[in-house]
């Protein structure tokens, strides 16, 4: 069972996640600092002032600074009530006036109890206009004091929320844009590296971005230039070797033409060896040629397979077909696909016992073609090495050849962004299926067998 990954894989996502996390931590830290050093001290001061007001309203006498006791007339107390908007309610009346919707705050009750010197309950009612504070003190346990905070409005906090949200969105958007700009050279490097992996040397990349990225880009350009020079030298070397080898082979062929009839069997054997040498040279050149960039075009896969089948039929070969009815339009390089199919058919003819089957189809927006034989097959542990250059399977399939035929097929399919699958044919031999994961114009129909 695969373990689930919760961390992002790409550097873009990781950097963006880091910036968002730091921004969130910064906002939380700012909130805690403002809460502890601004809001809570202000709230304590508010509670202290409110406690003084309640104490003055709940007692008949006030003690002045010089110790004098001052009696508060009822009319003066009512005037203070009116100016401050304070009203008194019994328990039942308070419930009807909104106490039932108020929420109890323990820390406010604790602070108010310290200021008033006895048990105090504080509740806060939040309505559409302004919050309301409800108090019940030990000075008058059956009376609720309603204090509206008229200077505080619910709309006062909306701009703060909008500004905070706007700052967060701007910070995240800026971080996303910054990281995208920083990662753009890396994306170019990735695409270029994939092309080099397919044997296609891209033009030199533009050196931009951070100094470290420019250094990597510069090193990559040097490496790509070196790989291109090496490939050009290899191609030139093989072209020269093939030319130099074909010259004496041609002279040998001319010499066999001058041999007498009594040496006809010897001349025929020499000509077969010459043809085999020419075939080996052609395979080397084909292997080098498949690494070059190929122009793609839309073509019918069944038509390409049909041309190869027509060309390879005969020569004591029985080629059966099971092609999907209709046209399978695939973006490909037709000549290269023909070469791949021909190599697969030749491989099946060389190692099989005369029976060959070529089939095609579409599945999950991918096209495929398959070549099967009735030979001894390949052991499963050896199949992964079959497409490597100069590998010809196990000893049961050891015959003449360079071992480049299927390696050429692998490079051609790789250049088409495809993949190869090896299996067992319906007659116990080898089955090779090539997938072309490109847009396919699929038609309705059945498979045609011949």
From Swiss-Prot:
Enzyme class: transferase
Source organism, top-level taxon: Bacteria
UniProt-listed InterPro entries: 2C_sensor_his_kinase, HAMP_dom, HATPase_C_sf, His_kinase_dom, HisK_dim/P_dom, HisK_dim/P_sf, Sig_transdc_His_kin-like_C
Domain Histidine kinase, chain residue ranges per copy: 240-440
EC numbers for this chain: 2.7.13.3
Binding site for ATP: 243, 347-351, 373, 392-393, 402-406
Membrane topology: Multi-pass membrane protein
Function: Member of the two-component regulatory system EnvZ/OmpR involved in osmoregulation (particularly of genes ompF and ompC) as well as other genes. EnvZ functions as a membrane-associated protein kinase that phosphorylates OmpR in response to environmental signals; at low osmolarity OmpR activates ompF transcription, while at high osmolarity it represses ompF and activates ompC transcription.
Entry text on domains: Has several major domains; the N-terminal cytoplasmic domain is followed by 2 transmembrane helices that anchor the protein in the membrane; the periplasmic domain between the helices interacts with MrzA. The cytoplasmic C-terminal domain has a HAMP domain joined by a flexible linker to a histidine kinase domain. The HAMP domain by itself is intrinsically disordered. The cytoplasmic dimerization domain (CDD) forms an osmosensitive core and includes the autophosphorylated histidine residue.
Protein name in UniProt: Sensor histidine kinase EnvZ
Organism annotation: Salmonella typhimurium (strain LT2 / SGSC1412 / ATCC 700720)
């Amino acid at each position: 069972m695969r373990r689930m990954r919760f961390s992002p894989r790409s550097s873009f996502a990781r950097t963006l996640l880091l910036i968002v996390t730091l921004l969130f931590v910064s906002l939380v830290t700012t909130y805690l600092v403002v809460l502890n050093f601004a809001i809570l001290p202000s709230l304590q001061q508010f509670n202290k002032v409110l406690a003084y007001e309640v104490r003055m309203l709940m007692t008949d006498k006030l003690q002045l600074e010089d110790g004098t006791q001052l009696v508060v007339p009822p009319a003066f107390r009512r005037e203070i009530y009116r100016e401050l908007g304070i009203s008194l309610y019994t328990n039942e009346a308070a419930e009807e006036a909104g106490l039932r919707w108020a929420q109890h705050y323990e820390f406010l009750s604790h602070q108010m109890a310290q200021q008033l010197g006895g048990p105090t309950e504080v509740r806060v009612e939040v309505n559409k206009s302004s919050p309301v504070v409800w108090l019940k003190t030990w000075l008058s346990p059956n009376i609720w004091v309603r204090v509206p905070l008229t200077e505080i409005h619910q709309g006062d906090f909306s701009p703060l929320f909008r500004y905070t949200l706007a700052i967060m969105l701007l910070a995240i958007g800026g971080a996303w844009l910054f990281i995208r700009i920083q990662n753009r050279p890396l994306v170019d490097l990735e695409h270029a590296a994939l092309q080099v992996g397919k044997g296609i040397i891209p033009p030199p990349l533009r050196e931009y971005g951070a100094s470290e990225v420019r250094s990597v880009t510069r090193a990559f350009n040097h490496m790509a230039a070196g790989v291109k020079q090496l490939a050009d030298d290899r191609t030139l070397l093989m072209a020269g070797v093939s030319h130099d080898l074909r010259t004496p082979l041609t002279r040998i062929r001319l010499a066999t033409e001058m041999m007498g009839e009594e040496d006809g069997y010897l001349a025929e054997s020499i000509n077969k060896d010459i043809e085999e040498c020419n075939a080996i040279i052609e395979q080397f050149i084909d292997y080098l040629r498949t690494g070059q960039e190929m122009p793609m075009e839309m073509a019918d896969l069944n038509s390409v397979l049909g041309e190869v089948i027509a060309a390879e039929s005969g020569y004591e070969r029985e080629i059966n077909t099971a092609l999907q009815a209709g046209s399978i339009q695939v973006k490909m390089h037709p000549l290269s696909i023909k070469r791949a199919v021909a190599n697969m058919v030749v491989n099946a003819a060389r190692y099989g016992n005369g029976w060959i089957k070529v089939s095609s189809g579409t599945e999950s927006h991918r096209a495929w073609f398959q070549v099967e034989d009735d030979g001894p097959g390949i052991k499963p542990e050896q199949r992964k090495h079959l497409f490597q250059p100069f590998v010809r399977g196990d000893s049961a399939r050891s015959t003449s050849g360079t071992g480049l035929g299927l390696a050429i097929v692998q490079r051609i399919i790789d250049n088409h962004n495809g993949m190869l699958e090896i299996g067992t044919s319906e007659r116990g031999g080898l089955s090779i299926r090539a997938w072309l994961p490109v847009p396919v114009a699929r038609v309705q129909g059945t498979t045609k067998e011949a």
